[in-house]
Amino acid sequence: CACLVGSEMCIRDRYKIAGEQLPCVIDVSARCVATHALNIFGDHSDVYACRQTGFAMLCESSVQEVMDLTPVAHCAAIKGKVPFLNFFDGFRTSHEIQKIEMWDYEDLKDMVDMDAINAFRRHALNPEHPCQRGSAQNPDIFFQARESCNPYYDALPEVVEEYMNKVNAKIGTDYKLFNYYGAEDAEKVIIAMGSVCETIDETIDYLLKAGEKVGVIKVRLYRPFSAKHLLAVMPKTVKQISVLDRTKEPGSIGEPLYLDVVAALKDTEFADVPVFTGRYGLGSKDTTPAQIIAVYNNTEKKRFTIGINDDVTNLSLPTGPSPVTAPEGITSCKFWGLGADGTVGANTVSYTHLRAHETCADL
C-alpha cells in the first residue's frame, strides 16, 4: 500500500517492475502533490504522474468497490503479467467508515490462475534454468525489445474483464471496465472516475425525476485505456460529453482523462460530439450535486472548473442552489473539529455503538 510520498518516490522503480513483467499490486490512496503549498488531502495528482510507467491502473469509487475489485487487480496482474496500481480517493474513500460485504480468502481461491503462478515461479532466477534479465542494451536492439511488451497490454483489458465477470457471478454485481449509469437516451454524459461518481449518481437520480436526459460513465480500468469498451457503453443519443479530471497539468491543452477520451472518440460515430473538460476536487475540495448540475447545464465553456470561484481566469461555472438529492428518511450530520481535539475518534466510537444497537441497523 502507498499514499503520496511512497507513490511518488517509487516512480522510477515502477518502470523496472513493469518492464520485467513482475505481477505486483500497489494499493494507493490517491492524494494531492504539493505545489505552491503543501496539501495532504485527496485528488489524482500522484496517480496521474504514474500513468506512463507501464503499470495498469484500476480505480474504485467506494469502499465496497475497493473490497470487490482489489482481487481483480491481483488476479489480473498474475495472469496478465502486468503490475497494477490499484487506487481510490485519499481520505474520501480511504478513511471512510462504511458497512460493506466482506470477502473471505476461500471465496477467492477458485479465481486464482495457479498455472500463471507456477509459470511466474519458473521464471525466478535459478541456476538450474538460467535466463537473462535487467541487461544494458544498445540502440541497435533496445527499441525492438521495448515494443515486444505490446501483446501483454493489448490483452489486459480482456483479462480484467474476465475477472470482473467472475466477481459479478459470485456476488451479483455488474462491474465493467467502464460502467454507465443514467438515462438510456441520455444527451448529456459526464465521464469521471473516483468517489465523485457517487455524487454524480445521486444527482442523476434527482435529474431523472425531473425528466432530464443525463448519464455518467465511470472509468474503472484507466490503464490500459480501452477505447473499444468505452464506446460500447456510450449512449448513441449523446450530444455533449463533459470529462472531469481531479488534477491540474499546467500548460497542457487538457487534463489526462480528457485527452484519453478525445483520442478514443476520434474517427468514430461520436467524433463530432463536443467534449468539454473540467477540473474539480483538487486538494479534497468538496464537489456537490449543484456543481454537477452546473456541468450538465454548461454549453459555453469548453474548459471549466467547479467548486471554486475563479475570478482570475474566469473558468469556474456558476452554481445554482443546492438541491436535496438524498433519499427520503436520510438524516445527515456534519461534525466540525479543530484538529487533534478528538472529534474523529469520538465520532468513530459513537458510530460503532450506534451500529451495535438493533434500532440503528440501517446506519
Spans of features found by a protein language model:
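Short acidic, glycine/serine/threonine-rich loops at helix termini
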Residues: 12-14, 35-41, 68-71, 95-102, ...
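Anionic-ligand anchoring segments at beta-strand to alpha-helix junctions in alpha/beta enzyme folds, i.e.
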Residues: 191-217, 333-361
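Conformationally flexible catalytic loops at phosphate/diphosphate-handling active centers
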Residues: 84-179
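Conserved thiamine diphosphate
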Residues: 38-90, 267-283
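N-terminal alpha/beta PP-like core and its mobile active-site loop of ThDP/TPP-dependent enzymes
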Residues: 8, 12-58, 86-87, 107-109
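Glycine-/acidic-rich phosphate or pyrophosphate-binding loops and their flanking alpha/beta elements
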Residues: 165-188, 317-332
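Peripheral docking tails and interdomain loops at the edges
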Residues: 240-326
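Single conserved hydrophobic/aromatic residue that forms the stacking wall/gate
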Residues: 1-6, 11, 353-356, 360-363
